[in-house]
């Protein structure tokens, strides 16, 4: 990992996919704030074009050059950038311009105060989050693959169709299932799609993976938590409908057929997520999920 100490962030990149003018204004304000403090600032090329700024860079260039990446947007933006930038080991920090903000935890109204604490005073922590790698194997060869920070969801292309499959963990048969699909979630993703399907919440530091059935056709089907270093593979009944799909973080889709085998395991890439020094996961969790406050 790149060395990160007080005032060691010299080259900082700004990325995100602004959906409205307010978010775009945040990009410009952060750019000007960083330039005023004599940082070398890179801007993702599409944003740079919209704002008519210099130093527009492709994501790959940002990963190779930047010491820190500021993601401005919602969790969806952070997910996309995590998949693209994790392999470069560059830390990411998020300014929330979306809805939930589990991953982008800097509030826009206090962004500059919090960035000052982080960048100028070195008051930050870095958390490591692992990703999953999903592969499609056809006739013994990997034909496509992608990463996911939240979850790998395996389901029919058409909605309201069941599929039947077998799940193997570390090459050992675990269970078979008839359902609308299966969610394979990281601890990061345990508060996303997995949670809405009845899955457990896993704290981010756990080395664990959750297997969560989607509308199973048996009352005995329950979520299962396994070791994070497990290798998961799925085989599908040949009479399933021909068009199946892997969805990575709900953003990237990989089509496959019942003849293919699906392999899911921990990716070698690690997301380095930067938080302010006073970051508390349980405070964020309680706030987002509406938990009760302290009694004493």
Curated annotation (Swiss-Prot):
One of the protein's GO biological processes: NADP biosynthetic process
Subcellular location: Cytoplasm
Disulfides per UniProt: none
Top-level taxonomic group: Bacteria
EC number of the protein: 2.7.1.23
Keyword presence, Cell inner membrane: no
Gene3D superfamilies reported for this sequence: Probable inorganic polyphosphate/atp-NAD kinase, domain 1, Probable inorganic polyphosphate/atp-NAD kinase, domain 2
Molecular function in Gene Ontology: ATP binding; metal ion binding; NAD binding; NAD+ kinase activity
Keyword NAD in record: yes
Main enzyme class: transferase
Binding site for NAD(+): 75-76, 150-151, 161, 178, 180, 191-196, 251
Catalytic activity: NAD(+) + ATP = ADP + NADP(+) + H(+)
Residues at the catalytic site: 75
Keyword list, A-Z: ATP-binding, Cytoplasm, Kinase, NAD, NADP, Nucleotide-binding, Transferase
Record GO cellular component, one term: cytoplasm
Cofactor: a divalent metal cation
Entries under Pfam families matching the protein: NAD_kinase (PF01513), NAD_kinase_C (PF20143)
Described purpose of this protein according to its UniProt entry: Involved in the regulation of the intracellular balance of NAD and NADP, and is a key enzyme in the biosynthesis of NADP. Catalyzes specifically the phosphorylation on 2'-hydroxyl of the adenosine moiety of NAD to yield NADP.
Family: Belongs to the NAD kinase family.
Protein name: NAD kinase
């Amino acid at each position: 990992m790149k060395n990160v100490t007080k005032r060691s962030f010299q080259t900082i990149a700004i990325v995100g996919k602004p959906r409205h003018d307010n978010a775009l204004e945040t990009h410009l304000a952060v750019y000007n704030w960083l330039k005023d403090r004599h940082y070398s600032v890179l801007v993702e090329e599409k944003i740079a074009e919209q704002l008519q700024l210099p130093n527009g860079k492709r994501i790959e260039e940002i990963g190779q050059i930047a010491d820190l990446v500021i993601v401005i947007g919602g969790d969806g933006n952070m997910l996309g950038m995590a998949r693209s930038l994790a392999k470069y080991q560059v830390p990411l920090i998020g300014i929330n311009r979306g809805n939930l903000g589990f991953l982008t935890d800097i509030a826009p109204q206090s962004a500059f105060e919090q960035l000052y604490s982080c960048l100028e005073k070195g008051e930050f922590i870095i958390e490591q989050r692992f990703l999953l790698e999903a592969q499609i194997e056809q006739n013994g060869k990997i034909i496509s693959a992608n990463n996911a920070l939240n979850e790998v969801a395996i389901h029919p292309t058409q909605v309201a169709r069941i599929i039947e499959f077998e799940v193997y963990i570390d090459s050992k048969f675990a269970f078979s299932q008839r359902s609308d699909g299966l969610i394979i979630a990281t601890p990061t993703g345990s508060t996303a799609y997995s949670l809405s399907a009845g899955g457990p919440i896993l704290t981010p530091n756990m080395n664990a993976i959750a297997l969560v059935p989607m509308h199973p056709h048996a009352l005995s089907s329950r979520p299962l938590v396994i070791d994070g270093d497990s290798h998961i593979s799925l085989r599908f009944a040949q009479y399933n409908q021909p068009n199946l799909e892997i969805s990575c973080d709900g953003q990237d889709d990989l089509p496959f057929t019942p003849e293919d085998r699906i392999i899911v395991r921990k990716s070698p890439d690690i997301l380095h997520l930067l938080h302010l020094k006073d970051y508390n996961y349980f405070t964020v969790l309680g706030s987002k999920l509406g938990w009760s406050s302290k009694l004493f």
